[in-house]
């Protein structure tokens, strides 16, 4: 973004007031571990979890949560992708604190809903139901797949639909219990893997067992099945930068419709 920092560095920066560096965890492909070490030199090396093969987000998140739970059984966790842009970091941190306060005292899952600024067809949507008294948090009525243009326009006009940012907040017991309930095979693999966490055998065990996990997203594995799911609608200048097209919408364009980032 022309600021001299990578997206993962910006992600860590905006969470820094909420979390000490020793409590950051990064799950990534084995082939990117050296890049993570270079980008985040203050991150403890043991907090970089290397997937031997990509199995989608449910096994990825389960691996991190089972490992965190073994050392921090009362952990309150935020799961976030690192390829998003957030403009208003102060508001982002306020929203995260509210979500963490809620999950610290409730056996519930909170997903951050972004108030839509346009009828976007590239994101999934969260349909909110009733508001929880005394909070900014709403019960989730349904998760919606990426819509066509007309449906997206209806969602925006309705006012109770929000973009699914893929940012989840939960207590470690809440998510491990949910995975155990809805995807018991995945939980069984994590239980077996966890016996060797923090030992010399961990890498070999993960290499052997992780590829046997079903390839499934956390949305299908848990979010669309669990009952205690809530959303916290937010406006902090969020954009998913998973494609060049989404990046282009954030950049000024010249008279030819071209966008340029100057990197010195």
Language model feature labels by segment:
Residues 172-264:
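Left-handed beta-helix
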Residues 2-81, 87-97:
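Conserved N-terminal catalytic core of the sugar/cofactor nucleotidyltransferase
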Residues 48, 109-111, 231:
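Conserved beta-strand scaffold positions in the cores of enzyme catalytic domains, especially
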Residues 8, 64, 83, 126, ...:
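Residue-level signal for inorganic ion chemistry
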Residues 89-210:
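Conserved core of the sugar-phosphate nucleotidyltransferase
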Residues 25, 77, 160, 167-168, ...:
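A residue-level structural signature of the nucleotidyltransferase/glycosyltransferase Rossmann-like core
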Residues 28, 80, 147, 170, ...:
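A conserved hydrophobic position in a structured secondary element of the catalytic/binding core
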Residues 47, 139, 228-230:
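Conserved beta-strand segments of alpha/beta enzyme cores
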């Amino acid at each position: 973004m022309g600021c001299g920092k990578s997206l993962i560095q910006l992600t860590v920066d905006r969470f820094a007031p909420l979390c000490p560096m020793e409590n950051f965890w990064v799950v990534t492909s084995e082939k990117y571990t050296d890049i993570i070490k270079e980008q985040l030199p203050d991150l403890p090396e043991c907090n970089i979890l290397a997937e031997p093969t990509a199995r989608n987000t449910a096994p990825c998140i389960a691996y991190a949560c089972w490992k965190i739970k073994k050392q921090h059984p009362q952990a309150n966790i935020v799961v976030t992708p690192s390829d998003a842009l957030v403009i208003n970091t102060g508001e982002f941190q306020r929203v995260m604190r509210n979500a963490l306060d809620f999950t610290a005292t409730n056996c519930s899952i909170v997903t951050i809903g972004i108030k839509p600024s346009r009828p976007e067809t590239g994101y999934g949507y969260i349909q909110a139901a009733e508001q929880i008294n005394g909070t900014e948090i709403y019960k989730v009525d349904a998760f919606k797949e990426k819509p066509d243009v007309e449906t997206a326009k209806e969602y925006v006009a309705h006012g109770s639909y929000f973009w699914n940012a893929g940012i989840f907040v939960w207590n470690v017991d809440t998510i491990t219990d949910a995975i155990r309930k809805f995807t018991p095979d995945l939980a069984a693999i994590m239980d077996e893997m966890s016996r060797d966490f923090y030992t010399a055998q961990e890498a070999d065990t993960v290499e052997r067992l992780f590829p046997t996990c079903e390839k499934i997203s956390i949305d299908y594995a848990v979010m669309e099945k669990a009952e205690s799911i809530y959303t916290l609608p937010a406006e902090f200048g969020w954009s998913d930068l998973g494609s060049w097209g989404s990046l282009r919408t954030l950049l000024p364009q010249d008279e030819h419709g071209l966008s340029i980032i100057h990197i010195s």
